[in-house]
C-alpha cells in the first residue's frame, strides 16, 4: 500500500480548549509529511465539515486534534461512519480514556495501581465533607476535572479550608471532579508506539505540578529521557504501561502518564490517545532516544492507521 498516492487530511485545531496546542502539533505533522512527499492537507473541523472528506477525495486522516471533539471518540465515530481510515485509537478507547474517572475504575478492576480518590459531581457537591475527605486521603490533595485535558482546572489543595473552592473551580470545566491523594514522587510519561513501549520520560516542572503553562509555554520545565530509572524499574514500568494500554483498548500510539507515590510505587494517572507533536512534545523526545526521527515517527503513526 503506497500511502504517498493517497490524499491525506491532517485534522488539526478543532473546538476544544486545546485548539492552539493542536494547531502547533498539526503544523509540525503536516510539515513532516510534506517534506517526505506525502499529499497532505490541513483540515480544521471548526471551518470544514469533516463528513465531506471522502467526497472531497481524501483517503485517510492523520488525527492530531486534542481534547473534546477530536480525542473523545466523536471524531473517530464520524470517520468510521464515512469509511475513512484514521490514525490512533478507535471510538471506544478514545471515549473511555477521555474520562479519567472511568479509566481509573477500569484499571482498578484489572488490579492495576491508581491513586486513591473521591469523586464529586455537580449534584453531590453540596454534600461534600472536606474534613472526611482529608481524613481519608490526607493533605495535600490534587483536585481536577475528570474530562478536560492539558491540565486545565487543576488545583493543589494544601489545607482543608481550600477544598471546596478548588472543587468549585474545577466544576467550571466539567460536571465530574476527582479529588485525589497527592503523589509526591517522580512524574513520568511513557509512550507506546505499535505495541512497543518506548523509554520513559521524567518530568520536573519548575512549579509544584505539571500544569498548562509548564506543559506548553515554560522553558523551565525539565525533561529527562532516559528517566534515570534502574533497568529493573524501567522494565517494571514498561510492563505496567503495556497492561494499562491493553486494558483500555488503545491502538496505534498513545502516551500514558504515571506518578510515583512517596514510597516510589507507580500509580497510573491517565492516557493521552493523541499525544502532542510539537517541538516541546514528549513522544518525539522519547522516540528520538531510540533512533526514531520526528519524520520517521509521523510516517510510522500514519502507517498504523486502520
Swiss-Prot record:
GO function terms (MF aspect): ATP binding; D-alanine-D-alanine ligase activity; metal ion binding
Q: What does the record give as the reaction this protein catalyses? A: 2 D-alanine + ATP = D-alanyl-D-alanine + ADP + phosphate + H(+)
Q: Which GO terms describe its cellular component?
A: cytosol
Q: Which cofactor does it need?
A: Mg(2+); Mn(2+)
Q: In which pathway does it act?
A: Cell wall biogenesis; peptidoglycan biosynthesis
Per the record, the GO terms for biological process are:
cell wall organization; peptidoglycan biosynthetic process; regulation of cell shape
What Enzyme Commission number(s) does the record list for this chain? 6.3.2.4
Q: What NCBIfam families is this protein classified in?
A: D_ala_D_alaTIGR, PRK01372.1
Specify the protein name.
D-alanine--D-alanine ligase
Biological source species: Haemophilus influenzae (strain PittGG)
According to the entry, what is the taxonomic lineage of the organism?
Bacteria, Pseudomonadati, Pseudomonadota, Gammaproteobacteria, Pasteurellales
Gene name of the record: ddl
